[in-house]
């Protein structure tokens, strides 16, 4: 292959030797967990939270949120049942779908109606902010309060704020240029839609393609700056994120650029089982996980693999402060 391409192929990534043996993800996970425990005991840390955290409290995933908005739109042509077809129309892209919904509503709704539609689709009348995962995240902050610096969330909701408050942890939502108070900060880098519809804290979220591009291209956007600060100055723990967001990956690359040190951040990800119907499923799944692991190492991340989002993941978060 090297003779054919005229190049020398890499033998390792960040010191990880590529082996012909099957990747033992369980042993690798256990070693990574030990690294994580030591790291957050010795260093300040930040928590990066994604949709998986809010979904554990029965809030909708991104696609269900968009479907709920379609269903509540007053234009009357498309309904929630049309989501699969509309997804194809929008090239299977959630942010393109977000733009489609905005355009669909633009002539029929004002900004207030759009926000209200989003609020109803997000909460659907359910005042829920509790789950085993959220409880363990709160306990992690409680037990490591001196090291815990902030939450950076990509979620619109205030699930974490209400959960922290119920645990006696004073906190403050930051969703723009509002200045932090002397409380535990929760940064909403994609916008903020609290359960209690208060006029003075409404923040239109990053929902559609053009809004996403506006954040992406502006390196000095407050949300990009806060994420870079956390990535550069603290150990970061990623929970409930798919890690496919292009802007997040770009910021990780920037923060990790030219670094010769071992990966300093940690991401919890579900085990890969894409090849479950294949005869060589275990081998292929393990190999895919090995390659993914090395890809994330290039971004400065160590992977902690888990099997169950609702049972195993909370146990691993608990182990961080146990």
Where are these regions (language model features)?
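SIR2/sirtuin-family catalytic core signature
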Residues: 1-47, 53-57, 68-81, 85-94, ...
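Conserved RecA-like ASCE P-loop NTPase motor core of nucleic-acid helicases/translocases
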Residues: 151-153
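Short, active-site-adjacent cap segments at secondary-structure transitions
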Residues: 54-55, 158-160
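A short secondary-structure junction signal
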Residues: 161-166, 197-204, 247-253
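Glycine-rich phosphate-binding "P-loop"
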Residues: 105-133, 204-219
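Short acidic/polar capping segments at secondary-structure boundaries
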Residues: 156-159, 165-166, 191-195, 241-244
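Active-site-proximal helix-loop elements at catalytic-domain edges
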Residues: 1-26, 116-123, 190-213
């Amino acid at each position: 292959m090297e003779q054919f391409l005229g190049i020398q192929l890499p033998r390792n990534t960040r010191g990880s030797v590529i082996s012909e043996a099957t990747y033992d993800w369980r042993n690798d996970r256990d070693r990574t967990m030990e690294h994580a425990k030591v790291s957050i005991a010795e260093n300040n840390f930040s928590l990066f939270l994604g949709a998986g955290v809010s979904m554990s409290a029965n809030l909708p995933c991104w696609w269900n949120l968009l479907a709920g908005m379609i269903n509540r739109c007053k234009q009357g042509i498309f309904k929630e049942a049309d989501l699969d077809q509309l997804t194809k129309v929008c090239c299977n892209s959630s942010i393109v779908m977000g733009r489609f919904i905005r355009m669909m509503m633009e002539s029929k709704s004002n900004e207030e109606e759009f926000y209200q539609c989003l609020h109803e689709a997000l909460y659907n009348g359910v005042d829920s902010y509790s789950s085993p995962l959220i409880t363990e995240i709160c306990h992690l902050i409680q037990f490591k309060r001196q090291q815990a610096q902030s939450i950076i969330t990509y979620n619109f909701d205030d699930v974490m704020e209400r959960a922290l408050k119920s645990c006696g942890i004073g906190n403050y939502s930051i969703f723009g240029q509002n200045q932090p108070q002397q409380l535990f900060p929760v940064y909403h880098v994609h916008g903020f839609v609290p359960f209690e519809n208060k006029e003075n804290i409404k923040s239109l979220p990053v929902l559609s393609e053009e809004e996403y591009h506006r954040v992406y291209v502006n390196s000095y956007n407050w949300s990009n700056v806060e994420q870079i600060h956390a990535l550069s100055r603290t150990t970061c723990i990623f929970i409930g994120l798919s890690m496919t967001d292009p802007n997040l990956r770009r910021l990780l690359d920037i923060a990790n650029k030219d670094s010769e040190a071992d990966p300093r951040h940690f991401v919890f990800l579900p085990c890969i089982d894409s090849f479950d119907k294949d005869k060589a499923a275990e081998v292929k799944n393990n190999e895919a996980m090995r390659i993914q692991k090395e890809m994330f190492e290039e971004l400065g991340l160590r992977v902690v693999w888990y099997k169950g989002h609702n049972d195993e993941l909370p146990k691993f978060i608990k182990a961080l402060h146990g």
